[in-house]
């Protein structure tokens, strides 16, 4: 079941890739993918190329994939291990969702962080109280780690 679904998503990604994202298997292991997200132009991550690791569980799509950033990023919802605080990767997962939709959701999280559900409270505090300092740090990290 999982393998059939993963193969279908891979074919769909090839036919209709989401803008500014790409994903595919690492070597021959269809349960382990690498994804790339281009930093959205209207965000402090513009110009950056961010790599993510995707691990599909054997009961996919009934359980969400494990997705994390392998590129460091300064963001209130993404910690230093690359873990992402995103509801659809946890309790709001649905088998109707696809990797394409997950990547688009992560892209929109880069444009619109959610400081009210932070994984890194310190960054969320800076985001809420000093937006220009947040954007400066995010741009610096992007330049340092993602370009």
From Swiss-Prot:
Changing residue 83 to A: Reduces ubiquitin transfer between ubc4 and pub2. Reduces ubiquitin transfer between ptr3 and ubc4. Pathway: Protein modification; protein ubiquitination. It catalyses: S-ubiquitinyl-[E1 ubiquitin-activating enzyme]-L-cysteine + [E2 ubiquitin-conjugating enzyme]-L-cysteine = [E1 ubiquitin-activating enzyme]-L-cysteine + S-ubiquitinyl-[E2 ubiquitin-conjugating enzyme]-L-cysteine. Changing residue 101 to A: Reduces ubiquitin transfer between ubc4 and pub2. Enhances ubiquitin transfer between ptr3 and ubc4. Its EC number is 2.3.2.23. Changing residue 105 to A: Reduces ubiquitin transfer between ubc4 and pub2. No effect on ubiquitin transfer between ptr3 and ubc4. One of its GO terms (biological process) is protein polyubiquitination. GO terms for molecular function: ATP binding; ubiquitin conjugating enzyme activity; ubiquitin-protein transferase activity. Keywords: ATP-binding, Nucleotide-binding, Transferase, Ubl conjugation pathway. GO terms for cellular component: cytoplasm; cytosol; nucleus. Changing residue 90 to A: Reduces ubiquitin transfer between ubc4 and pub2. Reduces ubiquitin transfer between ptr3 and ubc4. The active site is at residue 85. The keyword Nucleus does not apply. Belongs to the ubiquitin-conjugating enzyme family. E2 ubiquitin-conjugating enzyme that catalyzes the covalent attachment of ubiquitin to other proteins. Mediates the selective degradation of short-lived and abnormal proteins. Mediates ubiquitination of pex5. Interacts with the E1 ubiquitin-activating enzyme ptr3 and E3 ubiquitin-protein ligase pub2. This is Ubiquitin-conjugating enzyme E2 4. It comes from Schizosaccharomyces pombe (strain 972 / ATCC 24843) (Fission yeast).
């Amino acid at each position: 079941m999982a393998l059939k679904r993963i193969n279908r998503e891979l074919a769909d990604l090839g036919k209709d890739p989401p803008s500014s994202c790409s994903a595919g298997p690492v070597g021959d292991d269809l349960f382990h993918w690498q994804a790339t997200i281009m930093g959205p132009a209207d965000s402090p991550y513009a110009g950056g190329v961010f790599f993510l690791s995707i691990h599909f569980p054997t009961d996919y799509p009934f359980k969400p994939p494990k997705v994390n950033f392998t590129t460091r990023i300064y963001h209130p919802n993404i910690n230093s291990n690359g873990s992402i605080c995103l509801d659809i990767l946890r309790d709001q997962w649905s088998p109707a969702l696809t990797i394409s939709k997950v990547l688009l959701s992560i892209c929109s999280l880069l444009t619109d962080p959610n400081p009210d559900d932070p994984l890194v409270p310190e960054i969320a505090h800076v985001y809420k109280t000093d937006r220009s300092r947040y954007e400066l740090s995010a741009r610096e990290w992007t330049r340092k780690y993602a370009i």
